[in-house]
Amino acid sequence: MWRPLENTPEVLEPYLQKIGVQDASVFDLFSLEEIPEYIPRPVHALLFVFPSSGTKTIYKGSRILPKDSDKVLWYPQTIPNACGTIGLLHAVSNGELRRKVNENDFIKSLIRTAEGSSIEERAKLIEDSKELEALHAAFAGPPLEVEGSEEDVETDLHFICFVKGKSKDDNHFYELDGRQEGPVQHSEIESDLLNAEVLSVIKNYIQSIDSPFFSLVAITTP
């Protein structure tokens, strides 16, 4: 079991830079009502954290694609508490960020291998990657513990990634969650990910889950 990541710029920005997106910047989004002017555009991905014990319904008008859809590169999550790293993998494997990963970084090699692999092979690729495990551990928080137990526990908070597809010509945005049945394709958008349509999907999830424990960050590059 891995230790969970925090959904904060202080954790995710250096992590992204370490895995090969040298000019990545990460910003907190504290409100869904107004799009902050201080966030540089374009925004290439959003990472949303919510309580996984809640009931998350598929947004009206969206559809679940096959796990091995060629529109996006989707990774299954099989390691407890690995959702933060899976979310980052989804971000850098799709949309504009996939074209910004350093060619010499091991993540670029992992992405290439994953694209030619079955879903089961992708899961094993992540499970067997000592480099990825070490990177996650370097940026993870302290172990979660239950009083009276020495065992680590699985967090209830879960990361999902909103990002565009692999092709520059694909204007749909996608919801990528390694615990679900596959990638979710949403509507086409004309702008970047910091968009009213995308925020509407996130608002829908917040309203459907009775909990204050949510966080949202935007990933940008110059």
From Swiss-Prot:
- Give residue ranges for domain UCH catalytic: 1-221
* Residue(s) at site: Important for enzyme activity: D177
Q: What terms describe the molecular function in GO for this protein?
A: cysteine-type deubiquitinase activity; deNEDDylase activity; metal-dependent deubiquitinase activity
Would you tell me the Gene Ontology cellular component terms?
cytoplasm; cytosol; nucleus; proteasome complex
User: PROSITE patterns recorded for this chain?
Assistant: UCH_1, UCH_DOMAIN
Listed InterPro entries = Papain-like_cys_pep_sf (IPR038765), Peptidase_C12_UCH (IPR001578), Peptidase_C12_UCH_sf (IPR036959), UCH_AS (IPR057254)
**Major enzyme class:** hydrolase
Q: Which family does it belong to?
A: Belongs to the peptidase C12 family.
> What is the official name of this protein in its record?
Probable ubiquitin carboxyl-terminal hydrolase 1
**Which species expresses this protein natively?**
Schizosaccharomyces pombe (strain 972 / ATCC 24843)
